[in-house]
Amino acid sequence: MRLSSSLIALVALAGQALALPFNELAERDTGLDVKLIPIGNTRVKAIITNNADHEMSFVKYNTLFDSSPVRKVQISKDGSIIPFKGIHLYYDIDNLPKEAYKTLAPGASAEAEFDIAETSDLSAGGSFKISAEGSIPVIDGQGTKPTSSIRFKANTLTMDIDGEMASRVASAIPELNKRTRVDNQTCTGQYAQLLQGGLRTCATYAQRAAQAASGGNAQKFQEYFKTTNQQTRQNVARRFQAIAQECSSANQGRTIYFCQDVYGYCQGAIAYTVPDRSHVVNCPAYWSLPPVLNRGLGPDHGYVIVHEFTHAPSVFSPGTVDHAYGYEQCRRLNAQQSLNNADSYSLFAADVSRN
């Protein structure tokens, strides 16, 4: 973790607060249909249709309909996954702004277009497979908060891509000049103090989680990762050890931390990671979280940092994705999904550290 010299010199603030509510959405398999259509060399259209008999509002964030460069699809070539070079957003599903939702009447559809070359290197050209599946939080009828989550699996596309044309598509993530100087500019004053405290909490969480993963209660590990395989437990412990080391490295490390929204993708989010550049960005909502929680599974500053560092392959490879948020949704994942889900690690770390 590389931070500014002014940040290193400051002492962290400490605090206690009650846990925030976490996601307890019921999940179902019907109500929304998602279709993918190729509309250009690297451009794709997504169409979502409300198949229910009532009005429904779906969350756009972290889905195919998010205007931010989040992972919308999975791209593969010759059986190998193409690395994702966009961002991973972390948000509080219970406090989303109105613009996070799109409302659909029964039978109505919504469309979104995006360029897959903005977040993946497709310059090799040739045949690529494009797929999308996951869960979308929804509000059934009138309401202000999601009432359930609907699983979907879109059709798989096979696209013959011109590599030269794809290479000319601009990346969705702009280059930042003098990145360490930007860090000096964003992590100052109270931001610096709070971040230092968050990093210390992160280190504590990760150290305790590493111990619990390698030699702790097997049932507790099973609760979050759906397996008790000893080799898997050791691998999870190694990820936590790497996170603990990164959280303890104030003037060195593999990531760069920004305390303000240098890329402009914070709308509705608490924090986000740019894994391809090893950048972690705190949003304004991050600073409103309690610095430290002593009970429960809600997010505090250290919890969010653990979550974000699991996304960074420079800390531990491969980096994780966001299959689900919160205890109830994460509990529905299978073993493979759980081991690749950022919030599963934060929840496990919080549980073994606080409870």
UniProtKB/Swiss-Prot annotation:
This is Neutral protease 2 homolog MEP6. It is found in: Secreted. Belongs to the peptidase M35 family. It catalyses: Preferential cleavage of bonds with hydrophobic residues in P1'. Also 3-Asn-|-Gln-4 and 8-Gly-|-Ser-9 bonds in insulin B chain. GO terms for molecular function: metal ion binding; metalloendopeptidase activity. The keyword Signal applies. PANTHER family: NEUTRAL PROTEASE 2-RELATED (PTHR37016:SF3), PTHR37016. One of its GO terms (cellular component) is extracellular region. Keywords: Cleavage on pair of basic residues, Disulfide bond, Hydrolase, Metal-binding, Metalloprotease, Protease, Secreted, Signal, Virulence, Zinc, Zymogen. Secreted metalloproteinase that allows assimilation of proteinaceous substrates. Shows high activities on basic nuclear substrates such as histone and protamine. May be involved in virulence. Transmembrane segments: none annotated. The active site is at E308. Disulfide bonds join C187-C259, C266-C283. One of its GO terms (biological process) is proteolysis. Its EC number is 3.4.24.39.
